[in-house]
């Protein structure tokens, strides 16, 4: 929460890459607070002791976590923010790499909670799940990330068919 903020704030759950809550994601979260958001960045590695201090070990640790349990952790974070007394009930999700996929997943799984999602180069949801998305999306892909980008044409087609508001940047 920004020190100078007054009143209820929009909230953002910030989802890290596939290596835990590293200093970069902590800084993104801090900057969102400065910008006037109630921001929360859970560490998926908390059950294993938290981010170990370097990304290589973080990747190794995260590979040991159950994927659905991690997803449930981020769902719980978004639901907590929606009900937080300092928040205004509106919750966005932003994620990077693995976290971009989770931002998409949150938009699918908890559409009554997620008011906006901003995935950075995350995996796309299954086409049949896209109609569940009610939030506008601001999607970012990296030009040379051919693995993730390969899913974009089908995702875009599903977004258009479901009339989901989106903007994509490559």
What are these regions (language model features)?
Residues 1-86:
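Serine-hydrolase catalytic machinery in alpha/beta-hydrolase-like enzymes
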Residues 31-34, 143-170:
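Active-site-adjacent alpha-helix of alpha/beta-hydrolase-fold enzymes
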Residues 22-26, 49, 101, 128, ...:
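Short N-terminal helix/helix-N-cap motif within the alpha/beta-hydrolase-1
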